[in-house]
């Protein structure tokens, strides 16, 4: 069978593969703990459920406009005003099948083959693959100081004649790092100066800790006209725990949104009207659930960090937000894929290899589950990796024996 060059170059989502493996083990009755997932466990907002049910009861579940229904656009406009102090028109907004699709369609709208997309390391696993799908080239920018916090110089040294767009994801998946206000200001000004598109992936912007506040990219923009090349991405998946609803959006100049709408109209058409109604319910409804989730995640983060700090040799930077911890386990195994496979095979703990995010020797651990799962998972990992651990471990009535050194 002959496949296209692009198809042969694309790898599947590692998190989805891990989800499948974990599900198969659970079906067999194995006591799997999943620290690889990227979805909160809190309940979906009741306002979202009621809005969906109300529309379903009308029996009018039809095609939706390719760029989203007017009522959802109105809610997104209000959201943008509230959190970014920026008023935009409906023509500046597109609703997509999740923030992932919004980013993908934005890249398709602006990239030509062989042009370059720059993003700081560590990066979300989909950015390089999205660039490939556009026939473009992903260019990772590793901070010179080895931290998770880029400086403008780290981006500048990667800029070339083929650079078309920079993607910034803060708070960051997988590190949880919230980039400094100075860096956001610098990157906005630099991209304006160089006439480069800037995609701000703000999907986690309300899930931040320690009293920090979301950073508004528009605050530093000199050009807020229809010539602006800022593309703002967000969605309901993370902050409202609505991962299965697949509603995200982009805010950008009218020309970009028009191009994105044309592309999306030939790919998926508009998102399901039922799911758009759910998003409206979440955006317009009671917001206390977001703060409740944020507080829970901050507490879970603190517990995970305390447990990881008991690992001798493991290096961990305290996340500023999201629901991920990105820890350096290279003292035990430099090959993160090998380490991740070892942990699921030996102690049934699912993690995501750091190599998928551009940093070998690291593991991404999610702390959005129950505290009992978090603590037990880290204890299992420590037992498997620490050579000073006892020879036996009991998981329920099951006895595990170390048969490795």
Where on the chain are the PLM-derived regions?
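Short beta-strand to alpha-helix junction loop
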Residues: 67-68
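Short, surface-exposed loop/turn segments at secondary-structure junctions
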Residues: 63-64, 291
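Glycine-rich loop-to-alpha-helix module at the N-terminal edge of alpha/beta enzyme cores
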Residues: 35, 58-62, 75-78, 82
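PLP-dependent class I/II
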Residues: 3, 7, 11-13, 18, ...
């Amino acid at each position: 069978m002959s496949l296209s060059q692009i198809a042969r170059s694309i790898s599947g989502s590692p998190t989805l593969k891990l989800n499948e493996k974990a599900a198969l083990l659970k079906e067999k009755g194995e006591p799997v703990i999943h620290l690889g997932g990227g979805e909160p466990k809190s309940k979906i907002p009741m306002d979202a459920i009621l809005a969906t049910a109300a529309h379903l009861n009308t029996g009018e579940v039809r095609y939706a406009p390719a760029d989203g229904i007017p009522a959802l656009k109105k809610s997104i406009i209000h959201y943008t005003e509230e959190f970014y102090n920026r008023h935009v028109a409906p023509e500046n907004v597109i609703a997509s099948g999740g923030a992932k699709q919004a980013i993908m369609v934005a890249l398709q709208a602006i990239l030509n083959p062989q042009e370059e997309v720059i993003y700081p390391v560590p990066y979300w696993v989909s950015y390089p693959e999205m660039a490939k799908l556009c026939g473009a080239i992903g260019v990772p920018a590793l901070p010179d100081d080895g931290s998770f916090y880029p400086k403008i110089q780290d981006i500048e040294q990667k800029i070339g004649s083929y650079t078309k767009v920079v993607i910034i994801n803060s708070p960051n998946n997988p590190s949880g790092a919230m980039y400094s206000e100075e860096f956001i200001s610098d990157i906005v000004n630099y991209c304006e100066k160089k006439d480069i598109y800037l995609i701000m992936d703000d999907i986690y912007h309300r899930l931040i800790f320690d009293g920090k506040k979301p950073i508004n990219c528009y605050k530093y923009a000199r050009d807020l006209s229809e010539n602006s090349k800022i593309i703002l991405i967000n969605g309901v998946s993370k902050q409202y725990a609505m991962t299965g609803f697949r509603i995200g959006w982009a805010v950008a100049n009218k020309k970009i949104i028009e191009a994105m709408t044309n592309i999306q109209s030939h790919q998926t058409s508009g998102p399901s009207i039922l799911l758009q109604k759910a998003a409206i319910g979440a955006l317009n409804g009671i917001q206390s659930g977001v703060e409740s989730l944020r507080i829970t995640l901050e507490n879970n983060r603190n517990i995970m960090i305390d447990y990881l700090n008991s690992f001798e040799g493991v290096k961990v930077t305290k996340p500023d937000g999201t629901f991920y911890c990105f820890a350096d386990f290279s003292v035990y195994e430099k090959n993160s894929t090998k380490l991740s496979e070892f942990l699921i095979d030996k102690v049934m703990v699912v993690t995501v290899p750091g190599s998928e995010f551009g940093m070998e020797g690291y593991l991404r651990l999610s702390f959005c589950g129950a505290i009992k799962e978090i603590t037990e998972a880290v204890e299992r990992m420590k037992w498997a990796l620490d050579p000073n651990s006892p020879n036996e471990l009991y998981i329920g009535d099951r006895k595990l024996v170390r048969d490795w050194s």
